[in-house]
């Protein structure tokens, strides 16, 4: 008889070994290389004793994939799917199945990273270029970015940009029309406070009465009204104000674009182009402006350049505007955006094309006209005289009956006040839905006939779009929007683009400080469940009890992980989390009469988002030096804290440091800052080396954001979505963000919002919930310990060939390490960019380049990579070192060798002539491990300078590809 127990056979911890890459035998061999006999021993060797904790997590025992999915399904069932007419920027939509299965559910799309290495990212770059073209066409403007986080934060970015470019330098006032979405006004007010802007909210028609640097209008407005805003825009611009217009892509298929009316900026939510509501997200915001403002535009911009063979190639353009380069002088702190969702929206436009989109918009508009005519026949007073898809109306005498019938029929109307209602129709609504809507408004015996109403609309009984606002201009005329309308062609187009990109489904992506770990299939499955996808964020709370339980449980787990006392799920990126955390710190200081505290200390090794976030809070950034070992220089820190004195607000510190070590003095850093009255903001970028081993709260931090798209398995999506919830100690809890429409328990009522929806991109919280449920407390600690093992194994093996720039106690690194390439450059003229491009020939994405130290690469393997994959990567770097040595020895010229010519493409090796001093095999199959499944870059090295000097951010003519 076997001594194995039933509990062992049930194997509840099976997922742990699925998530963690090295097998038990591989771990044993790797530990032997490091001279230790267990993960526990390595952890004690590596993590300072002052912060190392015994196993402490209370997140429960691990569950199998099946068990966790069943548990989450029971939570999901507590959400009620009702028919939403709420609108306000969120609409039910029909996701084309070819996009659902082949993009949203496809790891080739969702596990890629932000396209910093464009030669192996041409697919998603093309999809993003299509998104920009779509945005430019529909808004009527010259230039668009490749997505922002949501409509409300895009509005805040528009305000900040308006201040940068406005010629009315004397004014510090910004006007917001009172018919802008409520949640947008909320977020803009929050952002404006620490910029020192005066916000004026009033009727749109009064905008030009004020002396302002900028104005925000909504078109169509919150009530659905269509106004011709051309004259108002002109009046504002005559007074040197910049005009930003929040708009709706679906309406712009039928109504005159704001760009044609003179708007300087147009933005909004692209959600209704084939992305589920998801109780608030994730969705891609669009943002367009005029060419003259291009250097002030926030977010990523995709541009057309050329490669070394002169062929068109795409890249992220004008990166010098961004936080990772300009730091506190950046246009925005945006890092992660919403690439996956922008790509879905762009594919939606490609699949339907201009005719299909126009047909969808016409159907929505026709149903709205039918409803409006039916209401008028019933004597209902409409507030708006013109509309696209939204009606606001008054039914004071029957309000209670309307609400009761709506609830019984499962309909959610927008309640705009006592007896005032609003309805917004969308792509998913049908004539049957209109029948139900009439029944809710007027009872079963309403006597309205949809076909009769339709014939009257067709006969001209309704003029809902004024003649001067009917769209006359064309859009989406580029061939890409007119070729892929059968599913066969669309499927092949998506696959063609996917094949151009390297993602985690092909090989390790060892980007330091980015934590490109496994995004398990079981974690992804619930994202597409309708119980999570089809809820409007402003639906009645009783319909979202599943979401409330999801958020509550996940918050409890993350509080346990971080050692904090409260958690906010509202920030929808790490950068937004930083901003929300600094906001809580400043509000806390103000509550104690210390509003003068405005100095933020930031180590020189910090991520670029840190100083960019601090400047958004109008803080003065003071840089703290690091010593020769890569640690914060305690003498310099003390001197600068002393100098700041009573003006010290906080320090922003990353732990483990971005130099890849656990700093021994981290508790001393926290104590010193606290002694000077400051708060400690611990950047959560490197939490993957803390979970279950130590915690920010235990170390002494007051607030942190968590990158759920790093540590807790939300995929990077090629540049988003992400989530950046913040944890805080109790004294900061009341200063967490709240929401103007849906009040959140805990934070003070009236606290401003930092995102459009109360729980940010709520639908992807399911991914992190699944990860923690399946790993349990034991698995989470093992993941951190294995991340430490993999990094130290890499460092040990590579140290025989390269200098590992920084090490901590016992000569260990944390979960990542920095490899010094400067000697290679000195000897052979081979720079880190050459190593990065050459790695593509070996089938790898480059590690992080020149951060935090120029001339280096930072490698983070994560716990999900096997020993075999680590060995393959080690072999690639060692081989590249040998190639550089040949250059140094003069065997290959410095200007003509496999490194400076990398990456190599099929076009290179099929050239009739080959005039290089190395053979084709060396170029493309440099080691045996580059096998039959080799990844081929589809373009050669891209000319960055040419791309920025000849900025082109729209789809190039197809002839340019010939």
UniProtKB/Swiss-Prot annotation:
The modification N6-(pyridoxal phosphate)lysine is found at residue 710. Its cofactor is pyridoxal 5'-phosphate. GO terms for cellular component: cytosol; glycine cleavage complex. It catalyses: N(6)-[(R)-lipoyl]-L-lysyl-[glycine-cleavage complex H protein] + glycine + H(+) = N(6)-[(R)-S(8)-aminomethyldihydrolipoyl]-L-lysyl-[glycine-cleavage complex H protein] + CO2. Signal peptide: none annotated. SUPFAM superfamilies: PLP-dependent transferases. GO terms for biological process: glycine decarboxylation via glycine cleavage system. The glycine cleavage system is composed of four proteins: P, T, L and H. This is Glycine dehydrogenase (decarboxylating). The gene is gcvP.
